[in-house]
Amino acid sequence: MILLPFHTRRLVSHVYCGLKPASQNKGIALEMTRPSSNLANFREAFAKAKHIAVITGAGVSAESGVPTIIGAGGYWRKWQAQHLATPEAFSRNPSRVWEFYHYRREVMLTKNPNPAHLAIAECETRLRKQGRKVVVITQNIDELHHKAGSRNLFEIHGSLFKTRCTSCGSVKENYKSPICSALAGKGAPESDVQDAKIPVEKLPRCEENGCNGLLRPNVVWFGETLDSNLLGEVEKELEMCDLCVVVGTSSVVYPAAMFAPQVAARGVPVAEFNMENTSATTTFKFHFQGPCGTTLPPALARHETELIS
């Protein structure tokens, strides 16, 4: 038996988003044991749970055909996401960054929720009628959970389909395709494609009266702080949950990498559904390996003890 220390200061003090290894700072020690893959035992815990927190990452959307931009092969042209998704990159070359996000927006407009998204949304709707709660905390910016029907939803890294004005701060939904005429036909990801070098005045602009400021995607970039109010709400949900389900997350991006280990530290069952083990897997009670579109639906299906309404 090995003990792994995890830092457990309040989440709102860990509001930086970036790729870095799991914390090894001193804190509450989590007992590391081999997690169970017994579905029947998980279903017993699921049947008893009144407040379920579902934490999702890029893996849940990969089965919808969404390109993963973190990890092996995660390139757009010759840049990795962490070299484009930064305030510094936008300041240096807003045209290139907007091409990158325009490409991602156009791709996402063609994608649909997969069985994992749908299982989570159906579970939320079904359990709500029983006076039980399911909340989804996602690192994804693709809005597929929303499209699937999830309503108790925290998009902690923002959305591809919202913009924020760099001048007045106005945040608006935006599903235009293309988002501006200058980006039409731009954004191809191949490494030999040259930058469009769009003049800044032709990039997406704010339509608030008298503003006309440059818009940026309303997403959290590497090195930026997350909304402390939003994280406060997330923390409340994690403190109240009596079951935590982790789906398709690599457990390397903070602060989300802390969420499930923090829940496990107070003795709440945590079930991980993932294609492979992560640095946090051995701190969880359950682990189900394989495509989440296959493993998750039977885990969240109606339990025999549920009343049919």
Curated annotation (Swiss-Prot):
Record remark on domains: In contrast to class I sirtuins, class III sirtuins have only weak deacetylase activity. Difference in substrate specificity is probably due to a larger hydrophobic pocket with 2 residues (Tyr-101 and Arg-104) that bind to malonylated and succinylated substrates and define the specificity.
- Keyword Transit peptide in the entry? The reply is yes
Spell out the PANTHER family in the cross-references: NAD-DEPENDENT PROTEIN DEACYLASE SIRTUIN-5, MITOCHONDRIAL-RELATED
Q: Needs which cofactor?
A: Zn(2+)
Per its record, the protein catalyses: N(6)-malonyl-L-lysyl-[protein] + NAD(+) + H2O = 2''-O-malonyl-ADP-D-ribose + nicotinamide + L-lysyl-[protein]; N(6)-succinyl-L-lysyl-[protein] + NAD(+) + H2O = 2''-O-succinyl-ADP-D-ribose + nicotinamide + L-lysyl-[protein]; N(6)-glutaryl-L-lysyl-[protein] + NAD(+) + H2O = 2''-O-glutaryl-ADP-D-ribose + nicotinamide + L-lysyl-[protein]
Q: Which residues form the active site?
A: H157
For this entry, list what GO says about its biological process. Answer: peptidyl-lysine demalonylation; peptidyl-lysine desuccinylation; protein desuccinylation
* Name listed for the protein in its UniProt record: NAD-dependent protein deacylase sirtuin-5B, mitochondrial
| Physiological role | NAD-dependent lysine demalonylase, desuccinylase and deglutarylase that specifically removes malonyl, succinyl and glutaryl groups on target proteins. Has weak NAD-dependent protein deacetylase activity; however this activity may not be physiologically relevant in vivo.
Task: Give the Deacetylase sirtuin-type domain ranges.
Answer: 36-306
Q: Which Pfam family, any one of them, does this sequence belong to?
A: SIR2
Q: What is its EC number?
A: 2.3.1.-
UniProt organism field = Xenopus laevis (African clawed frog)
Compartments annotated for it: namely: Mitochondrion; Cytoplasm, Cytosol; Nucleus
How many cofactor units bind, and how? Binds 1 zinc ion per subunit.
Q: Which lineage is the organism of this entry classified under, starting from the top rank?
A: Eukaryota, Metazoa, Chordata, Craniata, Vertebrata
GO terms for molecular function, please?
A: histone deacetylase activity, NAD-dependent; NAD+ binding; protein-glutaryllysine deglutarylase activity; protein-malonyllysine demalonylase activity; protein-succinyllysine desuccinylase activity; zinc ion binding
